[in-house]
Amino acid sequence: MATRYDPQSAEPRWRDAWEKADIFRTKAPKDAPGAPKAFVLEMFPYPSGRLHMGHVRNYAMGDVVARHKRAKGYNVLHPMGWDAFGMPAENAAMERKVHPGKWTYANIESMKAQFRKLGLSLDWSREFATCDPDYYGAQQALFLKLMDKGLVYRKASKVNWDPVDNTVLANEQVIDGRGWRSGAPVEQRELTQWFFKITAYADDLLEAVQKLERWPEKVRTMQANWIGRSEGLEMTFAFDGERPAGFEDGISVFTTRPDTLFGASFVALSPDHPLTLQLAEKSDALQAFRAKCAQIGTSEEAIEKAEKLGFDTGLTVAHPFEPGRTVPVWVANFVLMGYGTGAIFGCPAHDQRDLDFARKFGLDVFPVVLPPGADAAAFEVGIEAYTGPGHIYKSGFLDGLSIDDAKRAAIAKIEAAGQGEGKVNYRLRDWGVSRQRYWGCPIPVVHCEDCGVVGVPAADLPVRLPEDVTFDVPGNPLDRHPDWKHVDCPKCGKPARRETDTLDTFVDSSWYYARFASVSDPEERAYWLPVDQYIGGVEHAVLHLLYSRFFSRAMRDVGELDLPSGEPFAGLFTQGMVTHETYRSEGGTWLEPSAVERKDGQVFEIATGKPVKVGAIEKMSKSKKNTVDPDAIVATYGADVARWFVLSDSPPERDVEWTQSGAEGAARFVQRVWSFVDSLPETGPFPAPGSDDVSTALRKSNHKAVAAIDRAIEEFRFNSAIATIHEWVNALKKTESDPATLGARAEGADMLARCLVPFMPHLAEACWERLGQTSLVSQAMWPKIDASLVVDDTVTLAVQVNGKRRAEITVAKDMAPDAVEAAAKALPDVASFIAGKSVKKTIVVPGRIVNIVVA
């Protein structure tokens, strides 16, 4: 009698068996001679305390890859850790009066238990959290090595300052010009900050990203644009009339469009340009203007979105190509001091930002690029700048030239006059890593009045965070700690003070993959790196992934990594999100999916029985309460169902919508698989597969399915692999009442159990045991296929009459062309079209098509 599979009892049992046998512990290279290696890594999580379905999808994908590689004979490293520093822990400390460390480690234990329930094949022996002193101590040692190499330095830099919380805010924490928590207007302040010199690798990072063939093209393009290599001209506009002290030679500007110099109608300085600062010393109005600019966030995006602000300095400069023509000098809030020279020339006709500025302040607009086919006498620029192709006009010696030729000619003219030179610039800026927060990696330096900045000796690392801190007042607890920051200088022994800034948490995640490879063994790191398959969200395309590429190069160059290419991730996959419908009560309150029910095509609130407004399908978020608790899904259906559904319903790079009906369908399929396996005799051994037509057809189905699943996993088409498994199970079940197919069915069940391991490992183990096996299928090899059973001996051809498809025919691959022709003409749907007509010729293209031409 058939039994029912019970995931609630089966899944814990198999997880215990895996852990007892310790089957996911990574083998040392010497213990896996001859085996290829596979380092599979998903972006490690922040320990927020609860998993969400996005986590389930991300880590289920990585587990498919890791389990598949193991079954294919690879030595697999599939680790897990915690990206544990950051602001949420400090916020919890303030709100709940609990130490950030206590809150973080409690969350880690909670999430680890959730991960365990998912049946992930993780090597927990390599687990660490970035807030572990061992980890951040190694990071501090690395910081000092980079500092010795000249890749770390300090400089004054603009930051977003919250005057109420007394802290620096990241750009994303500034909302409409106000602090995200205090609501206070944010100020721009200049603070001395620590920087990593990522620009030292700009060319290498840009050139190498195009060689990452196993990265999504979208991510490679995003990184290339972020690095932003631009060739242009750095030139000096000489003053016409008054020459401010220190700027007697003029104003140096950088432009990527020297072809539009004849269209220049203003020069604009950054509010932080040295000349602006000098002029502001004698102008209260300019001081007030700079203060207004300082209320805007420091990010390019914030500045770009802000209203265009301008201040006329009253100064003018001479146009380099038109004697007697002068150009006014303004200060503009959209000019960045950190890019180029901190000054630009504006050509409103061919740059939208310049045009918006010019229209607001009544500045001239001179078109100098004529679109193809446009009338030079009639062409005008309206509210949109023209940034397309064309040739140069109204530009003296540049007239008639293409844009590229005009750029070269303008640069040559400026260089010949000694007014500037062609130059390459980058959008990429050095990475500011100072954070005025407690819960982060302490920067391992001390400040001595006599010796300056002194690195902490290696013997004194890690510089540990003090435990006795309070969060009852705003600001950095390290700054106001009575003892921690006071220390003797390691060089001269005199009283000094510790650096109280901590490192940006992106530093923690920029080298963790190397720590997973080995804590300290350079040979083991060389063996495992680069990561063979990295999996995570596309939102990390620029910052995390770019910083990691910088760090791996820097670590290589200070002798920490034997990684000639400098690339940390050979393959990258960016998965889509898990989405869900949104629900609102009649009063407009967001409702959780568990708070609503469907009846007769309508949705009602369970508590009140009132109708619910069903909103858009969106990314799961706490704010809109459209989240599904993985623990609840596991408790109801089992982990295999959760894993199966998030992988089955959509290509992995696209979003997947979580639905109750989808989960129920996955649960039914689990029972369908079990009912097939359980239909086999309980005692073996099973007979060898028969050679009758039905058994042979079933064996072909078995072997073709394995080949298709194998290929789909390799190509990250997990949903296709799952679709193949569905079809395969259907084929197997159709023959379960035929005694002659027992051998072929038993072969199929054995292969199916092995192929289910990457997707539904608990069910796979139960099926394996039901087949009489005493080992763990998670340690079994991938099924071997018989090539002769995978190759079709028939082929299906399209049959056309006068080029129009009328039918199709399946014939033996080696059937003679004249026999194919005769069979095609005999098809009813073909015979009716050629009856009574003269067949002029018949074209048979082997393996593809039959075309009958009639008159």
Swiss-Prot record:
Q: Where is this motif: 'KMSKS' region?
A: 619-623
- Report any one BP term from Gene Ontology: leucyl-tRNA aminoacylation
| Cysteine pairings via disulfide bonds | none
Q: Which InterPro entries match?
A: aa-tRNA-synth_I_CS, aa-tRNA-synth_Ia, Leu-tRNA-ligase, Leu_tRNA-synth_edit, M/V/L/I-tRNA-synth_anticd-bd, Methionyl/Leucyl_tRNA_Synth, Rossmann-like_a/b/a_fold, tRNAsynth_Ia_anticodon-bd
Q: Which domain of life is it from?
A: Bacteria
GO molecular function annotations of the record: aminoacyl-tRNA deacylase activity; ATP binding; leucine-tRNA ligase activity
Q: 'HIGH' region: where is this motif?
A: 45-55
Q: Where in the cell is it found?
A: Cytoplasm
The family assignment reads:
Belongs to the class-I aminoacyl-tRNA synthetase family.
> What is this protein's record name?
Leucine--tRNA ligase
Supply the source organism for this entry: Hyphomonas neptunium (strain ATCC 15444)
UniProt lists the gene as leuS
